[in-house]
Curated annotation (Swiss-Prot):
Pfam families (alphabetical): A_deaminase
InterPro entries, A to Z: A_deaminase_dom, ADE, Ado/ade_deaminase, Metal_Hydrolase
EC number: 3.5.4.2
Natural source organism: Marinomonas sp. (strain MWYL1)
Binding site for Zn(2+): 17, 19, 197, 278
Cofactor binding, note field: Binds 1 zinc ion per subunit.
Record-level GO cellular component terms: cytosol
Sites where the protein binds substrate: 279
Protein name, UniProt field: Adenine deaminase
Lineage of origin: Bacteria, Pseudomonadati, Pseudomonadota, Gammaproteobacteria, Oceanospirillales
Domain of life: Bacteria
Molecular-function GO terms, alphabetical: adenine deaminase activity; zinc ion binding
Amino acid sequence: METLIELSKKMPKTELHLHIEGTFEPEQMFAIAQRNQVELKYSTVDALKAAYQFTNLQDFLDLYYQGMSVLLHEADFYDLTMAYLEKVHSENVVHVEIFFDPQGHLSRGVGFDVQIQGIYKALQDAEKKWGMTSKLIMSFLRHLSEESAFETLELAKPHLKWIDGIGLDSSEVGHPPEKFLRVFEACKNLGLKVTAHAGEEGPPDYVWQAIEQIGVDRIDHGNRALEDNKLIEAIKQRNLTLTVCPLSNLKLCVVNDMKNHPIKNMLALGLNATVNSDDPAYFGGYMNDNYASLINGTRISKEELFQLAKNGITGSWMEDHLKELHLKQLHALFA
């Protein structure tokens, strides 16, 4: 009899919460650093790999920004994105929705067009090669000002045909969604979808703000929404999808043990939880690893596995005919 892990590897999957800068494997980071003559703090690939064994958020962020520092040219963004797409294609991921953080690159003097052209070309090539579809989400860094977000939006305007949605990420505590209310209104007026990281470290109130003030189409993380019964009902009433990241939660100590992960509880409550990898190179795994961690840790059932995969398809921003196609494939596999 086929195991759940084998089934999870075969099933068509979507990834809705993925930071492209978080897919930087140590070998590739080192190679691009050498290509661009950027000096890293680490003299060998092995030394760099050792740094990936961080135990706190600050060490992770230090390493994350080191990685960003080597991305200088369009080819770098293309190579980074293509390596991720090739990896997840091998894991039966059929559709991806990718965040990129332009402000983190603009502050280093790397132009907006350099970033987006490299990423978008890779997304196009993945569709030509494998039929993998995608959406691109420009994310604002919440520790920066609303003014900086508006400036970034202006730079994005010539490229809006390539951008499908707007996100909000980085250090959550002390930077509530309402800080960016006006810029999100401007984005919605341009016809862009909106999502926001909320309720990972921040309080349930941040999730309320994302829903009621920003009017998000989706919630990224959302774990702490479970602390507020009225909030759970509000999320269900709006039929919002939660993009949950199990291994990220474990690595950043949002949960202390995978057996305590709230995703089973989310499903039991009728919430549209999905499985995603967040920053897979840093958090110990891509999509198959995240599903395996839930199967082994939380003992999800076959029905729950199906529901998670289904939620990933229905909660995506892909076109309806593609949703129907992938749902048909999913049903056939679980029949």
